[in-house]
Every structure is written in C-alpha cells, then in structure tokens.
Amino acid sequence: MTTTDLKPILVFDSGIGGLTVLREARVLMPERHFIYVADDAGFPYGGWEEGALKERVIALFGDLLREHDPEICIIACNTAFTLVGADLRAAYPQMTFVGTVPAIKPAAERTRSGLVSVLATPGTVKRAYTRDLIQSFASQCHVRLVGSENLARMAEAYIRGEKLEDEIVLAEIAPCFVEMDGRKTDIVVLACTHYPFMENVFRRLAPWPVDWLDPAEAIARRARSLVPLPNGFEPLNGEDPAIFTSGKPDFATRRLMQGFGLTVRSA
C-alpha cells in the first residue's frame, strides 16, 4: 500500500483552535493526509443548548463521513467531545473517534501545591463529564473550574493577528490564580484547543508562574496509536483541505490556513 492509498485523518473543531492538534498530529503521522473541518457556522460552541448542539454535530458528521471516509476522526474540541463523544460513537460505530477532554488526570499527577485550575468554555465547565474526571482523578486536589465566555473568540482574533488589550485578557484568566493556606495554583489546564495559541500572552500576564497544560500532543499520540503505520513510506507533500461550514472564511483565516499547509474548500 502506498501513501496515496491511505485514508485521511479528519480533524474537527468549532473553529481554528484544532490547528494546535493538527500541528502535533502531522508530526506523528507524516504518511497521512489530513482534512481539517471548522464548524465556524456554529462557533462558538460554549453557549449552545446541549440538545441542539448534539443534533448539529451528529448530523454534520453523517455528511462528513459519507464524503471523506476518513481513517479516524479527531474531535479537537473539549466542548463538543465532552457532550457528543458517546453519541457519535453510538451513531457511527464503524468509525473511530479520538476525543479531547480536559487534562485533569495529568494535572493532578503533576501538581505540587494541590491547587489546579481548569480554563475552559462555559459548556465544558458545566458538563457532568468534566466533574466525573475531577472525582475520578483529582479528588485529592482543589480544582477551580473557570468557564470563560470570551476567550475562544479572543483567541480566534489573536490568531488572525488582531491586537488584544492586556487588561481584557487578564480579566479572563485571573480567576485561575488561587491562593489558599500559603499555597498557590501551580497548574492551569487549557481545556479549549483555542487557548494554547495564547499561551505566551497568558505567561506574560500571569500573577505568578504556572504550568499551562496543553493536551494537543497527548491527543496526537493517542491518534497515532490507533492508526496503522505502513512499512516503508515517504512523508507526503502538498496541501491538505480545510473545510469551513459557513463557506465563507475571511481573508485573514484563509491566509492562516495557508500557513498551516491547508487550502480552504467549500463545505
């Protein structure tokens, strides 16, 4: 089997935050083509009513799987996967879905102070899935859940080159920093794939140094473990497609996609 015969990997997000995962996945799976799908017509997911979002994502994947027949699907969105992951697997049992969930377990293993914060969207914060992760893996820690209404949009603007005021960003991340009994938060879980693009800004504005935990590499490793590696291959050249459900990404977004080796196609 040649690399041209291999099925592509589909990476899905509500916007362009999933590019953080795509970047890592390409490093580990150089023999594969990728399809990046941004449901920008539904962005942001954090404020959606749960039933409506489930229906939207499940229906969208019906179309995507029929058209592209991928090897696996990476759901590079905490909000989507914590809500719809089980339903996607039930609706499409023939497909393998690799999910993105808040990196609470590794945070609990690494913290020295026992104070961990999870910076997420409101949707991820309120999910029972997230609270179950805390109960299962971080019950010995004090975990602060911080649901930002604005950071995903701000990250999209930042990635496109727009300037953000420091005080506005600081207001979003400030609740992550907790002092208790002489201890301080030492790990912040970035529980939205958009947020790692702003990690340098977060580091600069943070009241004190913390470990910002980005799950992208772990997601890519999990995907690699599920994708068969052919014997003898050469890394692929050429651009992969990016699909935006709105059908009309702006110029800055198209330019960004080119920087990631992606060519925008109509949905």
From Swiss-Prot:
Give UniProt keywords alphabetically: Cell shape, Cell wall biogenesis/degradation, Isomerase, Peptidoglycan synthesis
- Pfam families registered for this protein in UniProt: Asp_Glu_race
Query: In what pathway does it function?
Result: Cell wall biogenesis; peptidoglycan biosynthesis
Gene3D superfamilies hit by this protein: 3.40.50.1860
Q: Which positions are annotated as binding substrate?
A: 13-14, 45-46, 78-79, 193-194
| Entry GO MF terms | glutamate racemase activity
Its GO biological process annotations read: cell wall organization; peptidoglycan biosynthetic process; regulation of cell shape
The protein's enzyme class: isomerase
Q: Where is the signal peptide?
A: none
Q: Please state the Enzyme Commission number of this protein.
A: 5.1.1.3
Q: Which domain of life is it from?
A: Bacteria
Reactions mediated catalytically: L-glutamate = D-glutamate
Q: Which InterPro entries match?
A: Asp/Glu/hydantoin_racemase (IPR015942), Asp/Glu_race (IPR001920), Asp/Glu_racemase_AS_2 (IPR033134), Glu_race (IPR004391)
The active site lies at 77 (proton donor/acceptor), 192 (proton donor/acceptor)
What does the UniProt function comment say about this protein? Answer: Provides the (R)-glutamate required for cell wall biosynthesis.
Tell me its family: Belongs to the aspartate/glutamate racemases family.
This protein is called: Glutamate racemase
Specify the species. Sinorhizobium fredii (strain NBRC 101917 / NGR234)
